[in-house]
From Swiss-Prot:
It comes from Bos taurus (Bovine). Keywords: Lysosome, Membrane, Repeat. GO terms for molecular function: membrane destabilizing activity. One of its GO terms (cellular component) is lysosomal membrane. Its main location: membrane. Homooligomer; homooligomerizes at lysosome scission sites. InterPro entries: ARM-like, ARM-type_fold, HEAT_Maestro, HEAT_MROH2B-like, HEAT_type_2, Maestro-like_HEAT, Maestro_heat-like_prot, MROH2B-like_N_HEAT. It is found in: Lysosome membrane. The keyword Membrane applies. HEAT repeats lie at residues 3-41, 260-300, 344-382, 385-423, 1369-1407, 1410-1448, 1616-1652. SUPFAM superfamilies: ARM repeat. This is Maestro heat-like repeat-containing protein family member 1.
Length: 1652
């Protein structure tokens, strides 16, 4: 392409620089850079020319262009010729110095261009710069700045010029008047000095290795003299800081004698800057360079100023470091660098200065000093070697500091000391102890109040640092092994180091393993008289105790066990083999669980088994005695951690179990004397200890307890005057409580063969003695709740142990009645309506065990026990949640938390066990009735939570009774009807749980009856089993479903209830009509009516009385069970006067009240009568006018449709009749007529208003404040249709429609068609046999005068074709014929539905498509050409239908119309309507799919024509269009005869995969240009059409397509491209309002470089 084009393209891009959006400017810059990649010289020339010709272009835009030039130059410096470089140099120089004012971005960009060119053309750049750097004239600041930058970027090129530059610059320094210019000179001198130093440091690579520092010394000193003596004295803050920055590197170039001469003045001046500037990092950096220079020349001046230097630097290091301030952090690094220099030259004076600072109490001073000390220990290790003792001794006071920041700094110093051998010195162990102390810090000690300038320690706590330091030192510093082992063992046992146990154990394990590797058989712990080391017994006790809660303290349980395992040889030589296998199993158990999931009880049992096994392995009484002594000795250590202390008590008991009797007696006595009885939490541990010990030493244990009970500890004086001489009553109660608990645990642990003989005399008697006291000889029972709980728990444990004995059945407990009475008293004494302690649960559990023992309880005692337990448990209030309905309130108690809720559930379970235990004493129907009579008041309670609990208990009792009933002869079950009547109404309780349990009760009662009459226990009764299947229906909140289920239950009861029980059942149900739960009352009514229907022939003389009662109730109430009774009278009347009754009822006011509705439903009780009624109602609906049109207002433009009264009333009546379950046969008889009439009724009432008189009635009701049920014509028709479907046995249709929202759609104008479609689909699926007659009637409505009826019938018939049922019923031909006959209907809606129906044949009868393919294709193409549909909906349906037919029609028929279809649908690709776009593009994909045969060549033209729209609409704003494009392109691929392109489409366009559009388009264009180079022009011209698309994303995609096509085209394809047209279009896009479009246009312009 010509040079003219390259210039024009560059000009377009350069013109676009002025876009206001920064992203656009950056994109233009990028495009220029892209252009420059292939044509660097042309782009640079164009930029140079643009800037030269557009002098008035604003400097921000000039900056963008200069930046692009810099990038191009940097990337292609090797390709530039001298002329281009010269032009660029002149331009950049001119841009840089065009204005005298400083414009940073613009001038910096120009300077950067010069620096970039200078990397290769240094001579030319220097020539230009030096031309503006003339002696005697002050240069432009940017000239100096550029020289400085060049000296850094091209050291070897610039340094040879620096001698002349410095000599020229030196006189200029005096001429500089403004601080800004002086700052530039300072920066230049700094950079020049740095360049010289780098040059000198790399002389071996330098072009002139003869260059020496002396060559610059004179000029540098001259400059130094001006900077230091003039500018530093009088300049502003910014200038003074620049001077200080320059003096650092300059000091290295000063002559040695001059530097020594200047240091006395230089150092104080530099240090003074710390007080004047906030950004001190530059001062510190320069000071470090000066100090290094001074040290390098051996200056003595440093000694004089050392104190001031140290003081200033120390003040800097003590500045608080803010983590968000990198400048402060950098300053600290530079200051520490200065300290390193001073430490190397004056270590003694440095330490003399630093170490006294550690004694100060100031936080910042101490932290800063420690920071410096750590640094010099690491950085100047050689100089500090001889100072170790001094440094260690200076740490005494910091070790006592409680400040967290100081602690952290000390830990860091100790870490450094450990790595450099300090801790091996005397005093080093104190440092180790300090680290361990910090590892043991409690959480509260780590949290300090943070001030405004304080550092947060939350993320980097002292403890965390200490833990990591301890482990690091233990594992990585080899020399620390001798220091830490065995010293760290001393910290295991003291309680204050508990929190450090986990890191301690980890370190000790590592150290021990290393020592084992060094000497495998040598003992690890060498005591050698070291009294501070813990004994093996102390170690074992401590590690076992803390392992009881293994996840506390960073998982110290696992760490402790691992240490035990490593130390097994030192604990006892015999333990090795056992522990090597046992401890890993314990660790595996911990790995399998977490703190939340681990069972604490199970874990403690595992540890006790481990201890017990270890004791058995050792089998050494002396060792066991020592271990026991140590455990008892450590018990007081755990006073602050009661859970661990309780476990240690268990360990003591376990150890005593392996000891001799003498040892047991001694230690048990000591435990009793030293126990902290005032701490109730310790009682359990002490009792467990005695219980475990009793397993092996029952006599000794009981003896010690008896001795202690008889001692003075519990004795109270008989005299009133001595009452106050003994310990307080409260303390004594706590002792007695603990002792009672001990007796309980002893009973639980005692060998069962010894227990029965001792339980009454030694256990229960002593418990009683401990529980009561005597005052003046009178036995007084305490009211202390803790003491009561202890007694209850102990009785419970003792009775449970008795029951678990093999001889419990023959054991006679003489104190049984007394104990039961005491438990009942405790239960009654607890506050009602709440559950705060486990006394109820434990007392009832004790009674449960007691009940099973001989002798039997008296009836009154049983009754009192049952009443007390029920009264307490049932009355606990539930906990309502906000927004809960009564049915949703939980039966859980109001106890506020999961532990209490669990306690309640456990209590209920215990109550069930207690009642079943009592029932076992009288396993007869009478005994069952007595038990249920106790529950009866609760079953009928007005409080729901009490009912649900009582019915649940009843179900449990009945199930238990059924399972344990032993029948040796036929036993009459006299109270069956009474009991069924008790539970039956509960099947409709407000609480779902009550309903389910009630069904379970009835189920059990029916099986009890069967068992009593001789059926075997495993007999399965079909009727009884059906009850269980009805439970699901009881969960449903819909009352209709609920009571229908109750009706079903009553039917099942009626089938199995013996005749002589029927009247008792009915009388009981009559009583339930007054049940406080209205649901149960209604359920009783439903069941009464069902029983009368099913078994009324047996109660002939009772029927009139029953009906009379119900009719009288009808006048008093609206309740359902009363209304049901009235139905019989209406039924009798209607059997004789059907038409008259119907006519009179139709005259009832609308909407019908409940009385009228009940009476209508009564007419359905007999199928013959119901058929007559339905026939009359159909006549009323069909024969009268459906609606009237009238104008509500005179000025109304469209008349309102108002329903006529008689058809509306008939519809409502039909709904009521069909709603009755008994109307089913009649509905089935008239099913087609009812269905069609109601469906058409629905269609004609959509949007129709109620009759005027009804509207007036509603308004009057509203104005008077009375609630009135509104009557909506369409809803009434839908309800009637639903009722007909249900009664016709098509509940599945109703449910399907309900789930799909079909009923709601039927009621709306917008969704009516869809609703009809869903109804047809449901009918085809669930009611296929009904369709032939329904279709026959619908065919007759196809010519209805009402368009809505034609639409409805067509929609229904059309949907039927989607089901195979029409084919199975041989209705396909007639249905197709009927639909095709409606293609010319005047209604576009009908025509559209016809096409939809014809296409549905692909779903219902795909095998018939080929047979009818000519007619189907003709109909669809006719739809494409439908000209009477302004919205193209018919055409849309035709395209949808064609897409569905495509794979099934005859190939020959399809090929004949393929081209016509493709041409016809092409205009819809770019339709404004999303549906037309998506469907037409999808159909195009199907056409391609069908065209993979012989018609490829014919169809290729259409594929090529659609390729660009398909690619661009992948960016369509609507997802369905994008999906259609993906499919169409995948189908087009094979027709393009390019395997690579087809593979790309398949790989990138799969559904569900994210599409990277740019990558995909790039790959597609690459293959298009490779295989179809001749299509370039056509593709480009088509893409230009979309530059004007109304969719922003498509407009943005169009230039992308253009760019990628151009990117991949070859040179020989250039004639196909109309560059003029393309550039013009892209120029227009650069003005597009959408930023993304402009960005893509610029990107494309950058790719047009191929034409340049």
């Amino acid at each position: 392409m010509s040079e003219t084009y390259a210039k024009r393209l560059s000009a377009i891009l350069l013109d676009a620089v002025t876009d206001k959006d920064p992203q656009m400017q950056e994109q233009v810059c990028g495009a220029l850079c892209d252009f420059g990649e292939s044509k660097p010289a042309e782009v640079l020339s164009a930029c140079e020319e643009h800037l030269r010709l557009h002098e008035k272009l604003a400097h921000p835009y000039r900056t963008i262009i200069l930046r692009a030039m810099e990038i191009v130059v940097s990337n292609h410096i090797s390709e530039l010729d001298k002329d281009t470089a010269r032009a660029i140099i002149l331009l950049a120089s001119n841009e840089m110095t065009k204005v005298k004012e400083l414009v940073s971005d613009w001038q910096q960009a120009a300077s950067s261009v010069l620096v970039a060119v200078g990397r290769r053309f240094i001579s030319s750049v220097m020539e230009e710069l030096l031309s503006k750097f003339q002696p005697g004239l002050l240069p432009h600041p940017c000239t100096v700045h550029t020289l400085a930058s060049l000296s850094v970027s091209n050291v070897f090129g610039v340094v040879p010029f620096l001698t002349s530059i410095l000599s020229t610059m030196l006189p200029m320094l005096g001429a500089a008047k403004h601080d800004s210019m002086k700052v530039v000179f300072c920066c230049a001198l700094q950079r020049f000095s740095e360049s010289i130093l780098e040059y000198l440091a790399n002389l071996d690579q330098a072009p002139d290795p003869t260059v020496r520092k002396d060559a610059f010394a004179s000029d540098i000193f001259g400059a130094y003299d001006i900077l230091f003596h003039q500018w530093l004295q009088s300049g502003g803050a910014k200038l003074r800081l620049a001077v200080v920055e320059a003096l650092g590197p300059m000091s290295h170039l000063l002559p040695s004698e001059k530097l020594e001469e200047q240091l006395p003045k230089l150092l104080p001046r530099v240090l003074a800057f710390y007080k004047k500037h906030t950004e001190t990092v530059h001062v510190s950096k320069s000071l470090g360079q000066i100090l290094e220079a001074a040290v390098s020349v051996g200056s003595r001046t440093l000694d004089i100023h050392l104190n001031s230097l140290l003081a200033a630097l120390h003040a800097q290091i003590c500045v608080p470091v803010e983590s968000s301030s990198p400048l402060v952090m950098s300053n600290q690094k530079e200051v520490l660098r200065c300290f390193t220099v001073l430490a190397c030259c004056s270590p003694d004076r440095l330490l003399a200065f630093l170490l006294p600072k550690l004694d100060t109490s100031n936080e910042r001073t101490r932290v800063g000093t420690l920071q410096v000390l750590r640094h010099v220990i690491n950085a100047a290790a050689a100089q500090m070697e001889v100072k170790k003792p001094v440094i260690l001794s200076s740490m005494k006071l910091p070790l006592l500091d409680t400040n967290n920041k100081v602690k952290r700094a000390v830990v860091q110093v100790v870490s450094a000391m450990a790595h450099h051998g300090y801790l091996e010195q005397p005093g080093g162990k104190a440092m180790v102890e300090y680290i361990v102390q910090q590892c043991a810090l409690p959480p509260e000690a780590e949290i300090q109040k943070l001030g405004a300038d304080s550092e947060a320690l939350a993320a980097d706590s002292v403890r965390a640092i200490s833990v990591s330091t301890l482990y690091l030192v233990s594992t990585t510093v080899d020399r620390m092994g001798e220091v830490l082992w065995p010293y760290l063992l001393e910290f295991l046992v003291p309680i204050r180091f508990t929190r450090a146990l986990s890191p301690l154990c980890r370190s000790l394990v590592h150290l021990a393993q290393k020592r084992q590797e060094a000497g495998a058989h040598a003992p690890l712990i060498q005591y050698n008289g070291n009294v501070h080391l813990p004994s093996p017994y102390a170690i074992t006790t401590r590690l076992l105790a803390v392992s009881s809660h293994p996840y506390v303290g960073d998982g110290r349980g696992a760490a402790s066990l691992r240490l035990l395992n490593v130390l097994h040889q030192d604990i006892h030589p015999a333990l090795g083999q056992r522990w090597v296998t046992a401890i890993p199993l314990l660790l595996e158990h911990l790995d399998e669980y977490s703190e939340e999931t681990l069972s604490q009880k199970e874990w403690e049992e595992k540890l006790l088994v481990f201890l017990r096994d270890s004791l058995a392995v050792v089998s050494d009484n002396t060792w066991v005695c020592h271990l026991t002594l140590e455990m008892c000795k450590q018990l007081p250590n755990y006073n602050g951690t009661p859970l661990e202390k309780n476990f240690l008590y268990k360990c003591v008991g376990t150890t005593l179990g392996a000891a001799s009797s003498k040892v047991v007696r001694k230690h048990l006595r000591e435990l009793l004397e030293t126990a902290r009885y005032q701490e109730e939490r310790e009682h359990e541990g002490l009792a467990c200890c005695f219980g475990i010990c009793a397993i092996s030493h029952l006599d000794d244990t009981l003896a010690q307890l008896d001795d202690f009970v008889k001692s003075d500890v519990l004795r109270k004086s008989a005299g009133i005057f001595n009452l106050f001489k003994n310990r307080s009553e409260s303390e004594a109660n706590k002792v007695r409580s603990a002792l009672i608990l001990c007796y309980g645990h002893v009973a639980a642990g005692a060998p069962r063969e010894l227990l029965l003989a001792r339980v009454e005399a030694d256990l229960f008697w002593n418990m009683s003695e401990c529980f009561s006291t005597k005052v003046l000889g009178i036995k007084v029972e305490t009211q202390d709740p803790a003491l009561r709980l202890s007694l209850v728990q102990s009785v419970c444990m003792a009775t449970q142990a008795i029951c678990s004995s093999a001889h419990s059945s023959s054991f006679h407990l003489s104190r049984k009645a007394e104990l039961v009475a005491q438990m009942v008293e405790f239960i009654r004494a607890e506050p009602p309506d709440s559950l705060k302690t486990p006394i109820w649960k434990k007392a009832m559990l004790a009674c449960t065990y007691l009940v099973t023992l001989e002798p039997a309880l008296e009836e009154q005692v049983q009754a009192d026990l049952i009443h007390s337990c029920l009264h307490r448990v049932m009355a606990v209030l539930p906990e309502p949640e906000e927004g809960d309905s009564p049915q949703e309130v939980s039966a859980a108690p109001t106890v506020g938390g999961d532990p209490q809720e669990s306690l309640y559930l456990d209590t209920v379970q215990v109550l069930k066990d207690l009642l079943t235990s009592l029932l076992l004493w009288n396993m007869t129907p009478l005994g069952l009735q007595v038990m249920l009579e106790h529950l009866s008041p609760w079953i009928k309670s007005p409080r729901g939570h009490e009912r649900v609990r009582a019915v649940g208990l009843s179900a449990c009792l009945l199930q238990f009774f059924l399972q344990h009933l032993q029948i040796s002869a036929l036993v009459p079950f006299h109270n069956l009807g009474l009991l069924i009547g008790l539970f039956s109404p509960r099947c409709a309780d407000l609480w779902p749980a009550t309903r389910r349990e009630a069904v379970s009760c009835i189920h059990s009662l029916l099986y009890l009856q069967l068992t009593c009459v001789g059926f075997s226990r495993d007999y399965q009764d079909d009727v009884a089993e059906q009850l269980l299947s009805l439970k699901d229906g009881l969960v449903h909140p819909d009352p209709a479903i609920l009571f229908h289920t109750c009706h079903s239950i009553a039917q099942l009861i009626a089938k199995r209830l013996p005749p002589d029980h029927l009247i008792n059942l009915l009388l009981t149900l009559f009583e339930s009509l007054g049940d406080p739960d209205k649901n149960c009352s209604r359920a009783a009514s439903v069941m009464i009516n069902c029983l009368l229907k099913e078994r009324g022939n047996m109660l002939q003389e009772k029927v009139p009385e029953i009906v009379s009662v119900l009719r009288s109730k009808l006048q008093e109430t609206q309740e359902e069970h009363i209304l049901q009774a009235a139905q019989h009278s209406v039924f009798a009347l209607a059997t004789h006067h059907c038409a008259s009754v119907v006519s009179n009822l139709l005259g009832s006011p609308l909407p019908f009240d409940s009385h009228t509705c009940t009476l209508w439903r009564a007419l359905a009780l007999e199928p013959g009568l119901a058929a007559q009624v339905l026939g009359l109602l159909l006549e009323k609906i069909s024969k009268d006018v459906l609606f009237e049109e009238s104008q509500a207002f005179l000025l109304s433009s469209t008349p309102d449709r108002v329903a006529t009264l008689l058809p509306l009333a008939a519809t409502c009546a039909l709904h009521e009749v069909a709603s009755a379950p008994a109307s089913g046969p009649a509905v089935l008889e008239l099913y087609p007529q009812l269905f069609v009439a109601l469906l058409l009724r629905v269609s004609c009432t959509v949007g129709v208003q109620p009759p005027r008189q009804l509207q007036a009635k509603e308004r009057r009701s509203a104005s008077s404040g009375l609630a009135s049920r509104s009557l909506e014509p369409c809803s009434s028709a839908v309800d009637a249709l639903q009722a007909v479907l249900v009664r016709g046995g098509n509940e599945d249709v109703v449910q399907c429609m309900e789930l799909d929202g079909g009923w709601q759609l039927l009621r709306t104008s917008a969704g009516h068609e869809e609703g009809v479609t869903r109804l047809a689909s449901a009918m085809a699926k669930f009611a296929g046999p009904r369709l032939p007659l329904v279709m026959k009637l619908l065919f007759t409505t196809q010519s209805s005068m009402y368009e809505v009826q034609r639409v409805t019938s067509t929609a229904f018939l059309a949907e039927l074709l989607s089901s195979n049922v029409v084919n199975d019923l041989m209705l396909l031909e007639s249905l197709l014929y009927n639909l095709m006959a409606r293609q010319k209907d005047t209604s576009a809606r009908v025509r559209r539905l016809v096409l939809h129906g014809l296409a549905n044949i692909t779903l219902g009868s795909p095998d018939k498509v080929q047979t009818h393919s000519p007619q189907l294709l003709t109909a669809m193409i006719g739809g494409l050409d439908d000209g009477d549909d302004p919205h193209s909906l018919v055409a849309l349906e035709a395209m949808v239908g064609l897409a569905r037919l495509m794979d099934l029609v005859d190939a020959w028929d399809l090929h004949a119309v393929l081209l016509h279809i493709a041409v016809r649908i092409r205009p819809f690709f770019d339709s404004e309507r999303m549906e037309l776009r998506s469907v037409s593009i999808g159909l195009f994909g199907h056409l391609n799919k069908a065209c993979r045969g012989d018609c490829k060549d014919v169809f290729l033209e259409q594929v090529v024509g659609g390729l660009v729209p398909l690619l661009l609409h992948l960016r369509d704003p609507h997802a369905p269009v994008v999906t259609a494009c993906r499919f169409a392109l995948r189908m087009c691929g094979p027709n393009l005869e390019c395997e690579e392109l087809a593979a790309v489409f398949q790989r990138h366009l799969q559904e569900g995969h994210d599409l990277h559009f740019g990558e995909f388009l790039n790959t597609t264009c690459k293959h298009l240009m490779r295989h179809f180079p001749d299509l370039l022009g056509r593709l480009l011209s088509t893409s230009l059409f979309y530059y004007k698309s109304s969719w922003e994303d498509v407009r943005a995609a169009a230039p992308m397509l253009t760019g990628f096509l151009v990117l991949h085209m070859e040179a020989e394809q250039r004639p196909q491209v109309d560059l003029e047209q393309l550039l013009t279009a892209l120029q227009l896009l650069l003005k597009d309002p959408a930023l993304k479009v402009r960005l893509k246009a610029v990107k494309t312009l950058g790719r047009l470089v191929k034409f340049a």
